[in-house]
Amino acid sequence: MDMDQQRFAGIARLYGQQGLQRLNAAHVAVVGIGGVGSWVAEALARSAVGEISLFDLDDVCITNTNRQIHALTGAVGRPKVEVMAERIRAINPDCVVHAVADFVTRETMTACITEAMDCVVDCIDSVPAKAALIAWCKRRKIPIITTGGAGGQIDPTQIRVADLNKTFNDPLAARVRSTLRSDYGFSRTQGRNYSVPCVFSTEQLRYPQADGSVCQTKGFVGEGVKLDCAGGFGAVMMVTASFGMVA
């Protein structure tokens, strides 16, 4: 058995040789290479997926250290997609990796997401971009799985998968649903399947306060607390990585 066969022999023993061949032939896009998406990309690479497209315009920031697999000291300031692509190639030199340093938006969708992709994993944290991507894939019958918000949570055992129209306790998923209904004509009927699997958590969110404490009620978030990357929801990799593994 040569090195290439040895690398994924464990995958073949789990899914069978035909299953391994299907993984080798698959092309998966990961949109958003952050706290969830970086772990998705890692899992795909280690599962013998033969072609992976990575989309993100952000650079690695030192504040990513707590939750993103590519956030190493030497990577700070470099494009996330480039760092992740190097990591994937180190895992599997035979994997074809497309590192696209751009955000997937309504305007860039045509150039980024095509029917040649077997699956798209949405790990974006922008509501308009998430909704645009989901609508685009649904209309073109490209399989897509989306992820809700992974910040403000500490218990990975509360992660679930449900249809996007049936999630709860997830403000990000709720806002995406609202946008899909208002801008893309998705059904307003509560509980009707969108046929879009969504990874989300049932856990009550923990909101940061200005005095350094946390609370579980948004209404008590102190003034001056901006829920952004630098000072918003806290996050821990055991949750963000679990979101990625479930996706």
Which positions does each model-derived feature cover?
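Conserved SAM/SAH-binding loop
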Residues: 100-109
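Conserved N-terminal Rossmann-fold NAD(P)-binding element of oxidoreductases
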Residues: 30-32, 55
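Glycine-rich phosphate-binding loop and adjoining beta1-alpha1-beta2 segment
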Residues: 49-92
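N-terminal charged helix/coil linker that caps or initiates catalytic domains
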Residues: 1-29
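Acidic/polar active-site rim loop that often engages polyanionic ligands
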Residues: 63-70, 153-164
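Glycine-rich phosphate/adenylate-binding loop
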Residues: 2-4, 115-117, 124-129, 144, ...
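Hydrophobic/small residue at the entry helix of a nucleotide-binding pocket
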Residues: 36
